[in-house]
Design a protein with these regions (language model features):
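Sequence-structural signature of mature extracellular/luminal beta-sheet repeat domains
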Residues: 1-303
Length: 303
């Protein structure tokens, strides 16, 4: 696969969105801000959010919604790479933010659910009903781990519910083409989960002791990060250590596309045929573009 370098020297890049004008909006987690990358590769700062803006998505109102982890990682340079490390002592949790693109106004929608803090909001995806599923990655402290989970929330800030609890390290989240399945990548287990949707914002009850269905668990020591779904249903998950994108078929088989960064963190699709793919290579601060072998799934809301 031929890849093209779009931009470099970014502050731990994540949350890419392919916009209709050909630009890419992305988050710089380490720097607490969002950037816009023009088709020519020119970078401009869109808005300063503070904390650690991680995932990003366009909502039904055309606004930008952010899962902000609140600065849950301390970044450290290791052999020339920018690596997210332990949670800083002063970290109090994260939040969900709404950004009005024309004005740049930042509004906090949620920072807790049922009285419990959102420890490290990570990724989100809107359904066709206008609400969104999002993951809380949790965070690691000297006293142990604050566990995250899978949540559903309304875009107007009126309701948030916890759909699955006590997951190890929830990360990427996406929807099947028919909207009937939520996919969630768990970082530290290298596992891709599937949860059946029973009604808007509600998952089917778990079966036995398992919170959902396991699509596959990667062998060896591989972490999973953010994801995007193909139009045909494959789930493309950014893969750490075995740097690149792993495409999961629903039968559990996988196909790996290597990228030059052991901390490959995200992918998004765009272009007229949805075969343009942008991939975040975060420890080296780079964004790459390539032609994907199959079209990606068009999201429910775009701008």
């Amino acid at each position: 696969m031929d890849i093209e370098l779009v931009v470099e020297d970014c502050g731990f890049l994540e949350g890419p969105i392919a916009m209709s004008d050909g630009s890419i909006i992305a988050t710089e987690i380490e720097l607490g801000r969002l950037i816009r990358v023009s088709p020519s590769g020119k970078v401009s700062v869109l808005v300063e959010t503070g904390g650690g803006p991680n995932g990003a998505a366009i909502g039904p109102d055309g606004a930008l919604y952010i899962t902000n982890n609140g600065g849950s990682f301390h970044y450290q340079r290791v052999n020339g790479l920018n690596i997210p490390g332990p949670t800083p002592p002063g970290h109090k949790g994260g939040c969900i933010q709404r950004i009005d693109l024309p004005s740049g106004k930042v509004e906090k929608l949620y920072d807790s659910c049922d009285g419990r803090p959102l420890w490290g909001p990570n990724d989100l995806v809107f359904d066709k009903h206008g609400g969104f599923w999002f993951t809380d990655h949790g965070c690691t402290t000297p006293d142990g781990r604050n566990f995250g989970g899978l949540y559903y929330a309304k875009a107007d800030g009126s309701k948030i519910t916890r759909a699955r609890d006590h997951m190890i390290s929830p990360n990427g989240v996406g929807l099947s083409p028919d909207g009937k399945v939520v996919y969630m990548a768990d970082t530290q287990t290298g596992r891709l989960w599937a949860f059946d949707v029973a009604a808007p914002g509600e998952l089917a009850p778990p079966s036995g002791f398992m919170p959902g269905r396991v699509i596959a668990t990667l062998p060896g020591y591989q972490f999973l990060d953010s994801l995007a779904v193909e139009a045909g249903g494959k789930v493309c998950v950014a893969t750490i250590f075995n740097g690149g994108i792993t495409a999961f078929d629903l039968d559990g088989s996988t196909e790996h596309f290597a990228f030059p960064d052991i901390v490959t963190t995200n992918i998004c699709f765009g272009g007229s045929d949805m075969r343009d793919a942008w991939v975040c290579c975060s420890s080296t601060g780079k964004l790459f573009k390539c032609r994907w072998p199959r079209p990606g799934l068009k999201l429910n809301h775009n701008a």
